């Protein structure tokens, strides 16, 4: 426990809160180019092949983004838009790729929650 004189000489430092999505730099979304599109496996109790992409953003950051929905058309050099939002069972994946924006197509045959997956209204 410091003395009052010690605290006057050197005050306590305020702890800075860590940002959850630093690569966005306070923006709601950022644009980037896919450098690698691949699948990865989730943490212990779950089992799947999750689709992810390594994305180089316009601000120079390189991040891993999750590709939601069934099926996708992404490949290397695809231009994508990312938003914040982690995937709980994939360590290091702190961003989501937006479907139906730029080079990413929406999910086919999607009937419910279409706006989340960039799907047009079925006729």
From Swiss-Prot:
Recorded hits in SUPFAM superfamilies, A to Z, give:
Nucleic acid-binding proteins (SSF50249)
Decide whether keyword Oxidoreductase is in the record. no
State the disulfide connectivity: none
Query: Which InterPro entries does the record cross-reference, listed alphabetically?
Result: NA-bd_OB-fold (IPR012340), Ribosomal_uS12 (IPR006032), Ribosomal_uS12_bac (IPR005679)
**Source domain of life:** Bacteria
Task: Give the matching CDD domains.
Answer: Ribosomal_S12
Q: Which UniProt keywords apply?
A: Methylation, Ribonucleoprotein, Ribosomal protein, RNA-binding, rRNA-binding, tRNA-binding
- What Gene3D superfamilies does UniProt report for this protein, alphabetically? Nucleic acid-binding proteins (2.40.50.140)
Q: Which PROSITE patterns does the UniProt entry name for this protein? A: RIBOSOMAL_S12
Q: Does the keyword RNA-binding apply?
A: yes
Which positions carry 3-methylthioaspartic acid?
Answer: 89
Identify one Gene Ontology CC term for this UniProt entry: small ribosomal subunit
Per its UniProt record, what Pfam families does this chain match?
Ribosom_S12_S23
Gene Ontology molecular function terms on file: rRNA binding; structural constituent of ribosome; tRNA binding
The Gene Ontology biological process annotation of the record reads: translation
Under the subunit heading, UniProt states:
Part of the 30S ribosomal subunit. Contacts proteins S8 and S17. May interact with IF1 in the 30S initiation complex.
Q: Which HAMAP family match?
A: Ribosomal_uS12_B
State the function annotated in the UniProt record: With S4 and S5 plays an important role in translational accuracy. Interacts with and stabilizes bases of the 16S rRNA that are involved in tRNA selection in the A site and with the mRNA backbone. Located at the interface of the 30S and 50S subunits, it traverses the body of the 30S subunit contacting proteins on the other side and probably holding the rRNA structure together. The combined cluster of proteins S8, S12 and S17 appears to hold together the shoulder and platform of the 30S subunit.
Per the record, the similarity remark reads: Belongs to the universal ribosomal protein uS12 family.
Read off the PANTHER family from this record. 30S RIBOSOMAL PROTEIN S12 FAMILY MEMBER (PTHR11652)
- Please state what the protein is called: Small ribosomal subunit protein uS12
Give the source species: Bradyrhizobium diazoefficiens (strain JCM 10833 / BCRC 13528 / IAM 13628 / NBRC 14792 / USDA 110)
Taxonomy of the source species: Bacteria, Pseudomonadati, Pseudomonadota, Alphaproteobacteria, Hyphomicrobiales
- What is the primary gene name for this protein? rpsL
